[in-house]
Amino acid sequence: MEQEQDTPWTQSTEHINIQKRGSGQQTRKLERTNLTQLMDHYLRTMNQVDMHKQTASWKQWLSLKNPTQESLKTRVLKRWKLFNKQEWTN
Protein backbone atom coordinates (compact mmCIF):
# COMPACT_ATOMS: atom_id res chain seq x y z
CA MET A 1 0.00 0.00 0.00
CA GLU A 2 1.32 3.46 -0.91
CA GLN A 3 2.21 5.85 1.85
CA GLU A 4 0.51 9.26 1.66
CA GLN A 5 2.70 12.31 1.24
CA ASP A 6 2.68 14.71 4.17
CA THR A 7 0.31 17.56 3.41
CA PRO A 8 -1.19 20.16 5.76
CA TRP A 9 -4.41 18.12 5.64
CA THR A 10 -2.80 14.78 6.63
CA GLN A 11 -0.70 16.53 9.27
CA SER A 12 -3.77 18.11 10.86
CA THR A 13 -5.44 14.68 10.86
CA GLU A 14 -2.33 13.28 12.51
CA HIS A 15 -2.55 16.06 15.12
CA ILE A 16 -6.15 15.07 15.97
CA ASN A 17 -5.16 11.40 16.33
CA ILE A 18 -2.28 12.22 18.67
CA GLN A 19 -4.51 14.51 20.73
CA LYS A 20 -6.96 11.64 21.28
CA ARG A 21 -4.13 9.41 22.52
CA GLY A 22 -2.85 11.91 25.12
CA SER A 23 0.37 13.88 25.75
CA GLY A 24 -0.85 17.52 25.69
CA GLN A 25 2.68 18.90 25.35
CA GLN A 26 3.31 16.92 22.17
CA THR A 27 0.05 18.11 20.60
CA ARG A 28 0.75 21.78 21.25
CA LYS A 29 4.14 21.45 19.58
CA LEU A 30 2.60 19.64 16.60
CA GLU A 31 -0.16 22.26 16.38
CA ARG A 32 2.37 25.10 16.15
CA THR A 33 4.34 23.31 13.44
CA ASN A 34 1.12 22.66 11.59
CA LEU A 35 0.13 26.34 11.71
CA THR A 36 3.56 27.39 10.42
CA GLN A 37 3.36 24.90 7.57
CA LEU A 38 -0.14 26.03 6.66
CA MET A 39 1.00 29.68 6.61
CA ASP A 40 4.00 28.78 4.42
CA HIS A 41 1.69 26.88 2.07
CA TYR A 42 -0.71 29.86 1.96
CA LEU A 43 2.10 32.34 1.19
CA ARG A 44 3.55 30.11 -1.55
CA THR A 45 0.09 29.74 -3.11
CA MET A 46 -0.57 33.48 -3.00
CA ASN A 47 2.82 34.19 -4.61
CA GLN A 48 1.96 31.78 -7.43
CA VAL A 49 -1.42 33.49 -7.89
CA ASP A 50 0.26 36.92 -8.06
CA MET A 51 2.78 35.65 -10.61
CA HIS A 52 -0.04 34.17 -12.69
CA LYS A 53 -1.98 37.47 -12.60
CA GLN A 54 1.10 39.41 -13.74
CA THR A 55 1.81 36.92 -16.53
CA ALA A 56 -1.82 36.99 -17.71
CA SER A 57 -1.76 40.78 -17.64
CA TRP A 58 1.39 40.96 -19.78
CA LYS A 59 0.05 38.34 -22.23
CA GLN A 60 -3.12 40.41 -22.60
CA TRP A 61 -1.03 43.54 -23.10
CA LEU A 62 1.17 41.86 -25.72
CA SER A 63 -1.84 40.53 -27.61
CA LEU A 64 -3.05 44.02 -28.61
CA LYS A 65 -3.50 44.32 -32.36
CA ASN A 66 -1.50 47.08 -34.07
CA PRO A 67 -0.77 49.14 -30.98
CA THR A 68 0.51 52.66 -31.58
CA GLN A 69 3.43 53.99 -29.61
CA GLU A 70 1.12 56.43 -27.80
CA SER A 71 -1.41 53.74 -26.82
CA LEU A 72 1.40 51.54 -25.52
CA LYS A 73 2.85 54.42 -23.54
CA THR A 74 -0.55 55.23 -22.01
CA ARG A 75 -1.19 51.59 -21.16
CA VAL A 76 2.24 51.13 -19.57
CA LEU A 77 1.82 54.28 -17.48
CA LYS A 78 -1.62 53.15 -16.25
CA ARG A 79 -0.25 49.73 -15.29
CA TRP A 80 2.76 51.30 -13.58
CA LYS A 81 0.57 53.65 -11.51
CA LEU A 82 -1.76 50.81 -10.56
CA PHE A 83 1.19 48.59 -9.60
CA ASN A 84 2.74 51.34 -7.45
CA LYS A 85 -0.58 52.05 -5.76
CA GLN A 86 -0.93 48.35 -4.87
CA GLU A 87 2.63 48.24 -3.54
CA TRP A 88 1.94 51.18 -1.21
CA THR A 89 -1.30 49.68 0.10
CA ASN A 90 0.32 46.29 0.79
Curated annotation (Swiss-Prot):
Keyword Membrane among UniProt keywords: yes
Keywords: Apoptosis, Host cytoplasm, Host membrane, Host mitochondrion, Host mitochondrion inner membrane, Host nucleus, Host-virus interaction, Inhibition of host innate immune response by virus, Inhibition of host MAVS by virus, Inhibition of host RLR pathway by virus, Membrane, Modulation of host cell apoptosis by virus, Viral immunoevasion
More about this protein: Is not encoded in all strains, and seems to be dispensable for replication.
Assembly with partners or alone: Oligomer. Interacts with human SLC25A6/ANT3 and VDAC1. Interacts with host MAVS.
Family: Belongs to the influenza viruses PB1-F2 family.
Region entry Disordered, spans: 1-28
Function: Plays an important role in promoting lung pathology in both primary viral infection and secondary bacterial infection. Promotes alteration of mitochondrial morphology, dissipation of mitochondrial membrane potential, and cell death. Alternatively, inhibits the production of interferon in the infected cell at the level of host mitochondrial antiviral signaling MAVS. Its level of expression differs greatly depending on which cell type is infected, in a manner that is independent of the levels of expression of other viral proteins. Monocytic cells are more affected than epithelial cells.
Primary localization class, coarse: host cell
Name of the coding gene: PB1
Source lineage: Viruses, Riboviria, Orthornavirae, Negarnaviricota, Polyploviricotina
Example GO biological process: symbiont-mediated suppression of host cytoplasmic pattern recognition receptor signaling pathway via inhibition of MAVS activity
Source organism: Influenza A virus (strain A/Ann Arbor/6/1960 H2N2)
Region Mitochondrial targeting sequence, annotated ranges: 65-87
Record site feature (Low pathogenicity), residues: N66
UniProt-annotated location(s): Host mitochondrion inner membrane; Host nucleus; Host cytoplasm, Host cytosol
Name of the protein in question: Protein PB1-F2
InterPro entries: Flu_proapoptotic_PB1-F2
GO cellular component: host cell cytosol; host cell mitochondrial inner membrane; host cell nucleus; membrane
